[in-house]
């Protein structure tokens, strides 16, 4: 089979349909978000971010988004409490907007 007809067999993949299956360990979340493990531990407890796992915390894509929103808010000058509130409000608004679509 020539390569062009092999390529014709393929279809685009919508990765957003699979994001809910992603599981990240603490170190991976820290690397993506650009924060320390100590910060992530503290933020996870303070913001009550849901994780899986018993021996090691496992973060899903929603938890990663929350961490990144908190980081963004802190980078813009908010204290941790205000950053957590802003992240929660942003996610609630985003969820509301996606339900309306």
Language-model regions: role of each:
Residues 38:
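Key DNA-contact positions within bacterial/archaeal DNA-binding proteins
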Residues 1-31, 45-50, 61-101:
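Arg/Lys-rich, alpha-helical DNA-contact motif
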């Amino acid at each position: 089979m020539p390569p062009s007809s092999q390529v014709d067999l393929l279809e685009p993949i919508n990765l957003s349909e699979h994001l809910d299956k992603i599981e990240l360990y603490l170190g991976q979340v820290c690397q993506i978000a650009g924060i320390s493990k100590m910060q992530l531990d503290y933020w996870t407890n303070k913001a009550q971010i849901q994780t899986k796992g018993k021996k090691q915390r496992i973060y899903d894509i929603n938890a990663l988004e929350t961490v990144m929103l908190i980081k963004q808010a802190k980078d813009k000058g908010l204290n941790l409490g205000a950053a957590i509130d802003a992240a929660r409000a942003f996610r609630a608004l985003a969820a509301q907007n996606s339900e309306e679509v």
